[in-house]
Curated annotation (Swiss-Prot):
NCBIfam families documented for this protein: AS_decarb, PRK05305.1-2, PRK05305.1-5, PRK05305.2-5
GO biological process: phosphatidylethanolamine biosynthetic process
Protein name, per record: Phosphatidylserine decarboxylase proenzyme
Family to which this protein belongs: Belongs to the phosphatidylserine decarboxylase family. PSD-A subfamily.
Native source organism of the sequence: Burkholderia thailandensis (strain ATCC 700388 / DSM 13276 / CCUG 48851 / CIP 106301 / E264)
The organism's taxonomic lineage, starting at the top: Bacteria, Pseudomonadati, Pseudomonadota, Betaproteobacteria, Burkholderiales
Post-translational modification: Is synthesized initially as an inactive proenzyme. Formation of the active enzyme involves a self-maturation process in which the active site pyruvoyl group is generated from an internal serine residue via an autocatalytic post-translational modification. Two non-identical subunits are generated from the proenzyme in this reaction, and the pyruvate is formed at the N-terminus of the alpha chain, which is derived from the carboxyl end of the proenzyme.
Pfam families the record matches: PS_Dcarbxylase
Cofactor: binding details: Binds 1 pyruvoyl group covalently per subunit.
GO cellular component: plasma membrane
């Protein structure tokens, strides 16, 4: 599914329109001295919903980062969505990061599962199991399974996903959006080699998150 994203994500258009109208009205009534906080708010909303194009690495076995942010976990963990032991890499997004999600690999969507939940701080490990989340399980052409989980955060209360089971995904393709501070967990096959470390800042699509193992 090719979901068209302009440089300002369309998820943000209503918020930008509302912020702009409020700023204009207050400016018209009270001048810039009264309206400047609302112009500042408009600038923040526009930067939050920015969605710039990114360079996409072509390395065949690369798993690309699905979101902008900071690495908060690199560990062996159980993937409950594909029922396996896996390498788990987690990316935390603060309110200043781009909040669109992009496919980490080329492949076909095996399933999409939504789970209601809490809205804990997404930087916490327990957010992976307790927060509202949406899992997309992808099968690559080489037979690997990659799971990408969108997780709502303390402020984020809306997960958007634009793909369904059976649809193809291309690496770097935009497939979802989380509003206002969140997290993405990626589960990879055992034997995958992480290319990032905890605390590292990463960029969606242009950062290589890990390398998949060769199929036997």
């Amino acid at each position: 599914m090719n979901y068209p994203h302009p440089i300002i994500a369309r998820e943000g258009w209503p918020f930008i329109a509302i912020a702009a109208v409020v700023a204009l009205l207050i400016h018209a009534v009270g001048g810039f001295g009264l309206a400047w906080p609302f112009w500042l708010l408009l600038v923040f909303v526009v930067q939050f919903f920015r969605d710039p194009p990114r360079a996409i690495p072509t390395q065949a076995n690369a798993v690309l980062c699905p979101a902008d942010g900071r690495i908060v976990a690199v560990e062996t963990a159980h993937d409950p969505y594909a029922n396996r032991e896996a390498l788990k890499i987690s990316v935390f997004m603060n309110v200043f990061n781009v909040h669109s999600q992009r496919s980490p690999v080329d492949g076909a969507v095996q399933k999409v599962e939504y789970f209601p939940g809490a809205f804990l701080n997404a930087a916490l490990d327990k957010a992976s199991a307790e927060n509202e989340r949406n899992a997309v399980v992808i099968q690559t052409g080489s037979g690997h399974t990659v799971t990408a989980v969108q997780i709502a955060g303390l402020v984020a209360r809306r997960i958007l996903c634009y793909v369904r089971a059976g649809e193809p995904l291309s690496r770097g393709q935009r497939y979802g959006f989380i509003r206002f501070g969140s997290r993405v967990d990626v589960y990879l096959p055992k034997g995958s080699r992480a290319r990032v470390s905890i605390g590292e800042k990463v960029s969606a699509s242009s950062t290589i998150l890990a390398e998949l193992p060769e199929q036997q």
